[in-house]
Curated annotation (Swiss-Prot):
One Pfam family it belongs to: Histidinol_dh
Chain's gene name: hisD
A molecular-function term among this protein's GO annotations: histidinol dehydrogenase activity
Gene3D superfamilies: 1.20.5.1300, Nitrogenase molybdenum iron protein domain
The record's free-text note on cofactor binding: Binds 1 zinc ion per subunit.
Protein name: Histidinol dehydrogenase
Protein family: Belongs to the histidinol dehydrogenase family.
Needed cofactors: Zn(2+)
Amino acid sequence: MISRIDLRGDALPEGPALRDLLPRADFDVSVALEKVRPICEAVHHRGDAALIDFTEQFDGVRLERVRVPAEELTRALEGLDPEVRAALEESIRRARLVHREQRRATHTTQVVPGGSVTEKWVPVERVGLYVPGGRSVYPSSVVMNVVPAQEAGVGSIALASPAQAEFGGIPHPTILAACALLGVDEVYAAGGATAVAMFAYGTESCPPANMVTGPGNIWVAAAKRFFTGKIGIDAEAGPTEIAVLADSTADPVHVASDLISQAEHDPLAAAVLVTDSAELADAVEKELQPQVEATKHIEDRIRPALAGRQSAIVLVDGLDEGLRVVDAYGAEHLEIQTADAAAVADRVKNAGAIFVGPWAPVSLGDYAAGSNHVLPTGGCACHSSGLSVQSFLRGIHIVDYTRDALAEVARHVVTLAEAEDLPAHGAAIKARFEWKVPESK
């Protein structure tokens, strides 16, 4: 059901050579990019009409309008199962606790007497948040996108999720109910690349956004790449992935269930166990089969995900080697199920989020840990972070110098300008001192 990669016995290679030994899904955004280009251009030129046509083509329903009426959000909240509502409210409460602490304060550094640099943080003015709606329904992604944007102080928040033919062309009612709980009333029935293009270009119904965030499939990732440099994006999110670093103290039942929990997202989802215990590897592999048979989404998601080239049990000589492997892999979700798990977690350099010990499974983070589940995938955790309040903030430096403070450093500025053959830079300093630049101290 799941392959093995044995890295024991030989010294592990460095850098790219080690990454090449590790399992990864085929996820070529460049191929999808050429297919989304005409979709994005059509939305640019035809606006809502293109959105309506593409929704009929891809989602099988003809819309009368793209924006969801406010009464649909009210109706969805009124019809929400009380237990689901309570769970969403608790998820929102915990997410707010964590994300509120991420706010950044204005800070001033006095460089010299009379010369200061202040860094202030300003929220993006308008964001477009995307919540997928293909294989599953993700009200939790509404929470994970909206809460950090709100806590950052974003003034205008719009959200898009695919139209559902089953519900007459509106997004899934649970998505709408989550929006209502969070006070988001600008919601659009738009999915995939069309939603990203709508936010990027704007249409008759939807003003353009400064930034687009949220998870999605390869078409969403391709559209984000298409608009890189034109609008802000969070990341090109690919298929979800879990890596578990475990030793002989780990419970194979827990490990197997956690691997399966992420495999049920998508047939391209990655599930990777890294361990120095052959006995644990055997026990986990034995445990996978009965757990898979006892759940849903077996043939269309879980089995192909576990059997795919992106999933494996990786055997290593010891914990140090295991840490090197998980750092090279850079998992979206990394569980540490070892002795002294907190100390081991502290040694990890590359992961979207780390889940410490047997009582912090990835599922907790997906819904109600307080952390964010919009995380870098495909090894991007080596250089990128998950969605947070900072994602929606821009740092602006405010430079404030008096005449004396400028005079003190003027000679250095002119010298560097001349060294770079940019005499007008130096002239801008000289002009303030009647072409007589005082000696820098």
